[in-house]
Amino acid sequence: MMSDLNGKRAELARLVSQANRIVVFSGAGISTECGIPDFRSPGGVWSKYRPLDFKTFMSSPAARREGLSRFLKIRDEVGPVEPGRGHAAAARWHRAGKLAGVITQNIDGLHQRAGVPSSRTVELHGNGTYAHCLECGKRHELDWIAGQLEAHDR
């Protein structure tokens, strides 16, 4: 088994060394090594919370508040995280001029924290480190949003 994994690593290294351009497609697996739970596996986020559909989220201030509260709770449970080996590899490929871009399902912003520019990152499900106001479009960092929710609850 280990020799098979080593063979795959060697093949990947060969492909990367020969490549002119690399596109990274990533999902939950790249961030689970960092301590971030995935959403769908047993014990994942959706086993604890029923997903909020987009229509409900957009039409109900209470649903938006609930969704943000859930997200903040998950963030606090996970705690601070650092980019993992996959994020670091993508950043190295960027610095080497080989990375065409990253397309990710993740919302954790770890590709950017590792050194991949936002301009080279497509986040299919958005970014969980900030949000835009639905009324004015202004960007707010998640810590600011958390403060607003806490102030509202007092």
Set out the residue ranges of the language-model regions.
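Conserved catalytic core of sirtuin-type NAD+-dependent deacylases
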Residues: 1-154
